[in-house]
Amino acid sequence: MPAFFVTGTDTEIGKTTIAAGLLHAARSAGLSTAAAKPVASGCEPTAQGLRNGDALVLLGQCSLALAYEQVNPLAFAPAIAPHLAAREAGVELSAARLHEAVREVLALQADFTLVEGAGGWRVPLLGRENLSDLARLLALPVVLVVGVRLGCINHALLSAEAILGDGLALAGWVANVVDPATSRLEENLATLAERLPAPCLGRVPRLEEATPAAVAAHLDLRPLGIGL
């Protein structure tokens, strides 16, 4: 069943917003859905334990019955880079450990599964490992979320180069307009479409309420080989 790794050009550029929109689009097409965000920092304490807002959003778009801990097995309170949060908590944040956790979700064989990373492609894990090493272990095609703002062309092209250089397929990309006041917005989008070696799955404008349904209205899953 189709599964994809979702990464972004930076942190705070709407990876979860786009991932939730993709999951909603798949559910609306009658597909079963599952998701994982294997590591998250900036989690809030609750009666059930630490909970991450982004992971909860993804969980809400899963049609399969998943426990929170399956979606987000490693949750840390400090709103800092995951490897630093893990170090403070005395947790070994290895690609192999994350891979084992994600495999549990992939084994459910949902019609459409997304695995969302944290930050960008080279976010550090344990030692010299990065989140890109997890993506390599999973061997999933990648969806790149481009946060459209000043500097996004360079960030997007470098990210795509790194993804392909790691031997993974770039299945598609999404233009998420995080700064609608970006100078020469249309020209920037045209350059991204010309230079990125993958189909664009959609252009998502800055929305007052970026609900999964509202985001899904701007996305197209067909380039991922999913008929709607």
Curated annotation (Swiss-Prot):
Catalysed reactions, semicolon-separated: (7R,8S)-7,8-diammoniononanoate + CO2 + ATP = (4R,5S)-dethiobiotin + ADP + phosphate + 3 H(+)
Enzyme Commission numbers on file: 6.3.3.3
A Gene Ontology cellular-component term: cytosol
Active site, UniProt feature: K37
Cofactor section: Mg(2+)
Keyword set, alphabetical order: ATP-binding, Biotin biosynthesis, Cytoplasm, Ligase, Magnesium, Metal-binding, Nucleotide-binding
UniProt pathway annotation: Cofactor biosynthesis; biotin biosynthesis; biotin from 7,8-diaminononanoate: step 1/2
Signal peptide residue numbers: none
Residues that coordinate or bind substrate: S41
Top-level taxon of origin: Bacteria
GO molecular function: ATP binding; dethiobiotin synthase activity; magnesium ion binding
GO biological process, one term: biotin biosynthetic process
InterPro entries, A to Z: DTB_synth_BioD, P-loop_NTPase
Localization in the cell: Cytoplasm
Binding locations of ATP: E12, I13, G14, K15, T16, T17, D54, E116, G117, A118, G119, P205, R206, L207
Coiled-coil residues: none
Keyword Transmembrane: no
Family per record: Belongs to the dethiobiotin synthetase family.
Family annotation (NCBIfam families): bioD
Subunit structure: Homodimer.
Protein name as it appears in the record: ATP-dependent dethiobiotin synthetase BioD
Source organism: Pseudomonas aeruginosa (strain ATCC 15692 / DSM 22644 / CIP 104116 / JCM 14847 / LMG 12228 / 1C / PRS 101 / PAO1)
Organism taxonomic ancestry: Bacteria, Pseudomonadati, Pseudomonadota, Gammaproteobacteria, Pseudomonadales
